[in-house]
């Protein structure tokens, strides 16, 4: 018998877990490093378990309570069939485990289980339309081939433009100076770093762009304008596809939402963790890969 419901929201940078009892009382929360399935199933599995374990400890529950937990996993890249099935073959100690995408978890939370649409712009980006009982993914195919308007994309563009500033192709920029100082003003160091960098590594530079833009840096301001244009393109396309209510989520999305107000965005009712818990508890919801 399931006594506890666990929601997990996992993206490229962080994995968060929340536990509630059958009455809906919040018992505990935990977090770990990112659990984007495309970056490695074993790695994501370990981070998911670590986040849930931290939440269990926060709740003061014994380890054997795991056998009475129903878990809803809302993880980045779960929309990819091979990642989805591989994750569900991993061993879990829980009574039940259900898996969906981080986008659908966020959508369920944003609209409290009702239909709607969301555009997440965090480390990565993904749009999802939940309409007439069906799910439609918009973008979100992974960095760098997709994920426009994301923190990873913004970080990549900042590095690209900073290298041009360093070479004298573009005018001087305080953002470019800070970035190049980080790499010891050595272009070869940038190339070596990029050979092994993951989306979260690029995304760590996104706050630097916001900081520089607030100080009036022209390059940073142009990069934020570019990011807004990318998100605007996605929002416009989703509207054309039938999305009449869209919540803009994620660290990048929420910071840029005031500049995209003409799309009549709606505020989320709940967060992605509540959406993941709702997914765990509800049978009649779309499955990514039946």
Where do the model's predicted regions map?
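ATP-binding/phosphotransfer module of carbohydrate and carboxylate kinases, centering on a glycine-rich
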Residues: 1-64, 110-117, 159-290
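Short beta-strand-loop/turn "lid" adjacent to the catalytic site in phosphate-handling enzymes
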Residues: 36-37, 53-99, 111
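Glycine/charged-rich beta-loop-alpha catalytic/anionic-binding loops adjacent to active sites
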Residues: 89-92, 135-142, 258-264
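Glycine-rich beta-strand-to-loop/alpha-helix junction loops that act as flexible
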Residues: 72-77, 121-124, 243-253
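Short, active-site-adjacent cap segments at secondary-structure transitions
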Residues: 79-81, 105-107, 126-127, 253-256
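Conserved phosphate-binding catalytic cores of ATP/NTP-utilizing and phosphoryl-transfer enzymes
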Residues: 1, 95-119, 134
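Glycine-rich phosphate-binding loop of actin/hexokinase-like ATP-binding domains
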Residues: 114-165
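Active-site nucleophile and cofactor-binding loops and adjacent substrate-binding regions
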Residues: 97-105, 120-121, 148, 224, ...
């Amino acid at each position: 018998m399931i006594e506890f419901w666990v929601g997990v929201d996992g993206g490229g940078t962080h994995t968060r877990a929340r536990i509630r009892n059958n009455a809906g009382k919040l018992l505990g929360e935990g977090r770990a490093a990112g659990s984007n399935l495309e970056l490695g199933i074993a790695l994501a599995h370990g981070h998911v378990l670590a986040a849930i374990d931290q939440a269990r400890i926060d709740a003061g529950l014994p380890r054997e309570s795991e056998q009475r937990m129903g878990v809803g996993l809302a993880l980045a890249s779960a929309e990819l069939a091979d990642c989805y099935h591989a994750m569900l073959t991993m061993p879990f100690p829980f009574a039940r485990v259900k898996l969906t995408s981080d986008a659908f978890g966020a959508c369920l939370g944003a609209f409290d289980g009702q239909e709607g649409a969301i555009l997440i712009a965090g480390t990565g980006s993904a749009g999802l339309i939940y309409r007439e009982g069906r799910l439609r993914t918009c973008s979100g195919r992974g960095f760098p081939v997709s994920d426009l308007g994301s923190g990873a994309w913004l970080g990549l563009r900042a590095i690209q433009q900073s290298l041009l500033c360093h070479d004298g192709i573009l005018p001087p920029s305080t953002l470019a100076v800070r970035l190049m100082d980080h790499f010891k003003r050595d272009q070869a160091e940038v190339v070596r770093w990029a050979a092994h960098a993951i989306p979260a590594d690029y995304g760590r530079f996104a706050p630097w762009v916001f900081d520089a833009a607030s100080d009036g840096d022209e390059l940073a301001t142009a990069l934020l304008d570019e990011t807004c244009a990318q998100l605007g393109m996605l929002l416009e396309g989703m509207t054309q596809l039938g999305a009449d209510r869209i919540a803009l989520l994620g660290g990048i999305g929420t910071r840029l939402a005031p500049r995209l107000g003409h799309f009549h965005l709606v505020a989320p009712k709940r967060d992605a963790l509540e959406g993941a818990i709702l997914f765990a508890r509800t049978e009649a919801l779309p499955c990514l890969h039946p």
